[in-house]
A protein has these predicted regions:
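Electropositive, intrinsically flexible nucleic-acid-contacting patches
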Residues: 1-250
Length: 250
């Protein structure tokens, strides 16, 4: 089990910087998540890692990891150093992966992404949509209102796929959405884009850990009930269903 997301003692280390240029060319969710993870390691000044480590932290399949590592290398965004033990394979999970100088963090040309974003078990699609909203976010109001189509065009996703990930992020309390209306020249009102408010990562981490603690308590309670039921014939325990004493026959 992964450790629960924790915040560093220094608030300045809550986030790492991702260059705006990452969205200036075509990129999909898996490619964004891989690059973002490498930027997080770079900011922490961690040593180079291999594909296996990235794969475990992003939750993608091995084939997906290898596929997009090859694509990112061909675009000059990452460098792969081959493991001598696996030279026959085109790409090995033991190959070392590092960022190149093609994408650089420049003053005033980056957006922040929370260091703890990889500890919540988010899918690469959720990470990518969350990252794009942070890219578009107003730094004073913490709001933005890109359309589903705009988000999808930036991440090579369909409108329905974007909607799915937005709803998941809202359910997990990373964002809050609010419908808007626009007034046309003829005075009629039409539904506008959703307005997104990005919740502070401090509150997200706190709420996440509270939910995990509640879940752990429920599981412990169920485990104790199951142990008791093993020694008391006639009892059945099912998750989410309160136990009932069987009726006695006359």
């Amino acid at each position: 089990m992964k450790p629960w997301p924790q915040l560093p003692s220094d608030p300045r280390l809550y986030y790492f910087a991702v260059p705006n240029e990452i969205f200036h060319s075509e990129i999909n969710a898996s490619e964004f998540a891989i690059l973002a993870y490498l930027f997080s390691r770079q900011m922490k000044e961690l040593p180079p890692t291999n594909l296996m480590t990235v794969y475990k932290n992003l939750g993608v399949s091995r084939n997906t990891m290898k596929k997009y590592a090859r694509i990112l290398e061909s675009r000059g965004l990452i460098s792969l150093r081959r493991d001598k033990r696996f030279l026959r394979a085109s790409v090995s999970m033991r190959d070392t992966i590092t960022l190149t100088d093609a994408l650089k963090v420049r003053v005033g040309h980056f957006f922040p992404l929370p260091n703890s974003v990889f500890g919540f078990g988010l899918s690469v699609g959720e990470i990518a949509v969350y990252g794009y909203l942070l890219y578009r976010e107003d730094r004073e109001s913490y709001e933005c209102w890109p359309s589903y189509r705009t988000i999808g065009a930036a991440l090579c996703m369909s409108r329905n796929t974007v909607m799915k990930y937005v709803h998941r992020l809202e359910e997990k309390e990373f964002i809050v959405t609010e419908p808007t209306q626009v007034r046309r020249m003829d005075g009629s009102k039409w539904n506008g884009n959703l307005k997104y408010r990005i919740r502070p990562i401090q509150s997200v981490v706190k709420r996440w850990n509270e939910k995990q603690a509640e879940k752990a308590k429920r599981e412990q309670k169920l485990l104790r009930a199951m142990k008791i039921a093993e020694h008391r014939p006639g009892f059945t325990i099912q998750p989410g269903i309160p136990e009932r004493r069987p009726q006695q026959r006359c």
